[in-house]
UniProtKB/Swiss-Prot annotation:
Topological category with respect to the lipid bilayer: Multi-pass membrane protein
Alphabetical list of InterPro entries matching this protein: Cyt_c_bgen_Ccs1/CcsB/ResB (IPR023494), ResB-like_domain (IPR007816)
PANTHER family registered for this protein in UniProt: CYTOCHROME C BIOGENESIS PROTEIN CCS1, CHLOROPLASTIC
Quaternary structure and partners: May interact with CcsA.
Family of the protein in this entry: Belongs to the Ccs1/CcsB family.
Protein name: Cytochrome c biogenesis protein Ccs1
This protein's record includes keyword Nucleotidyltransferase: no
Phenotypic consequence of R132Q: In UTEX 646 / Bohlin
Localization terms from the record: Plastid, Chloroplast thylakoid membrane
Keywords from the UniProt entry: Chloroplast, Cytochrome c-type biogenesis, Membrane, Plastid, Thylakoid, Transmembrane, Transmembrane helix
Keyword Zinc belongs to the record: no
Purpose of the protein: Required during biogenesis of c-type cytochromes (cytochrome c6 and cytochrome f) at the step of heme attachment.
Organism: Phaeodactylum tricornutum (strain CCAP 1055/1)
Length: 420
């Protein structure tokens, strides 16, 4: 019974079926939004009008289709597929490799008739044939008048490496799903922060209690005044608040600390900071009123009832903003350290900005990379041709034949050069 189960799991057709099933589940996870709120699923997949006739929000939540890649049944499929590859490797591929390493001598001349390439040579030097085969980089094994030769045995390792690479990729995927996390933080300049706003995490994830500080944030612009790049000067702090690592990050250039990646993803303007003639600091919050554009505004009142004042609009981090009155009339621009005369003079001392960070870790990524490395290596090795040649000397005749697993035409040319 156990052997039958092992044979079923090691069967190539069963492995292909599991692979197709995993691919189908991955497609489902791509089509259905992952890790969203229940309200989104209720809106997009209503009970009264099922998508594709079957998808409703309650079924999505019931079967875990809102987090496909972290469900027990998806892990079970990956585990079965990995087990199938392991059994196939040990029960089929390794025994096949061991057989290929053995000296498979032909004992009778009738065996040559099963080969696609074979011939009989009359009055041909046996030593001359062996010399040519040696010159073609074959390994030669001889027992009196019979000879077995092969080359390219390493090419038979390619299927084993394919299995190994797929197992590593699967293991890396599971490790990343169980122990990884992704968080998003919006942090004002000069502020400290901890990882708190978790977007996704695995069942066994331990969120690091790392403290960090945004020392500075700035933006570079092109000649056409569009954003070229934005940067954050970020420091990692220890428990005592002392800096242990510091780096300026930008888009596609993250800070990496203990396997945790800090990516620059977004930016925002938080407020304007003014100083009065009495050195009193006043802050006005900025509101982004457009989802598609980076435009912020604030209301600077000139009376206690907040009924009079000016509107300040800003769309950049170049150090200036525009002033409008209650009727929308443009009054002018104000730059940093410049005074605006309202009921009392105010000096713009700072445009308070914040940086958007995506913080994530995936402990399985190195395992996945190693899996792809072995996959590429197996692809290169698979191009190495595994060829075999058999010879039997009988009286004054030489029976010689060969076979190969690929590049048949090249092998035929090589074979005819040997017997020429």
């Amino acid at each position: 019974m156990k052997q039958q189960i092992f044979r079923l799991l090691a069967d190539l057709r069963f492995s292909i079926f599991l692979l197709l099933l995993i691919s189908f589940c991955s497609i489902v996870g791509t089509v259905i939004e992952q890790d969203q709120s229940i309200e989104i699923y209720k809106t997009n997949y209503p009970l009264t009008n099922p998508v594709f006739g079957v998808l409703t929000w309650d079924r999505i939540l019931l079967f875990g289709l809102d987090h496909v890649y972290r469900t027990w049944w998806f892990f079970a499929l990956i585990f079965l597929f990995g087990l199938s590859l392991i059994l196939c490797t040990f029960l089929q591929q390794l025994p096949s490799l061991k057989i290929a390493r053995r000296c498979q001598f032909f004992r009778t001349t009738n065996q040559f008739y099963r080969l696609k390439i074979s011939t009989v040579l009359n009055d041909f030097s046996f030593n001359k044939i062996l010399g040519r085969i040696t010159g073609s980089q074959y390994s030669i094994f001889q027992q009196k008048n019979i000879v077995y030769c092969y080359k390219g045995l390493i090419g038979r390792i390619a299927p084993i490496l394919v299995h190994l690479s797929m197992i590593l990729i699967l293991v890396g995927t599971i490790v990343g799903s169980l122990f990884g996390f992704k968080a998003q933080e919006i942090v004002p300049k000069t502020e400290n922060f901890h990882i708190q706003n978790i977007l996704a995490n695995g069942q066994l994830t331990v969120i690091p209690k790392t403290s960090a500080r945004i020392n500075d944030f700035w933006i570079t612009y092109t000649k056409t005044k569009t954003v070229s790049q934005f940067y954050s000067d970020i420091s990692i702090l220890n428990k005592q608040g002392n800096e242990i690592e510091r780096k300026t990050i930008s888009v596609n250039h993250p800070l990496i600390h203990n396997g945790v990646y800090y990516y620059q993803t977004d930016w925002n303007l938080v407020g304007l900071r003014f100083k009065t003639m009495a050195n009193e600091i006043i802050e006005y919050p900025l509101i982004n009123f457009s989802e598609n554009q980076k435009i912020w505004l604030t209301w600077i009142s000139t009376n206690k009832s907040l009924t009079e004042g000016v509107v300040t609009i800003i769309d950049n981090l170049e150090g200036y903003c525009s002033i409008y009155n209650e009727t929308g009339q443009f009054l002018g621009n104000i730059e940093l350290n410049e005074i605006i005369n309202l009921k009392q003079p105010l000096t713009l001392i700072e445009i308070i900005s914040s940086t958007g960070l995506q913080i994530k870790t995936d402990p399985g990524i190195q395992i996945i990379y190693s899996g792809f490395f072995f996959l590429m290596l197996s692809t290169l090795i698979s191009y190495i041709t595994y060829s075999q040649i058999w010879i039997i000397q009988k009286e004054k005749k030489l029976f010689i034949g060969g076979t190969t697993n690929r590049a048949v035409f090249d092998f035929e040319l090589e074979f005819f050069k040997i017997i020429k």
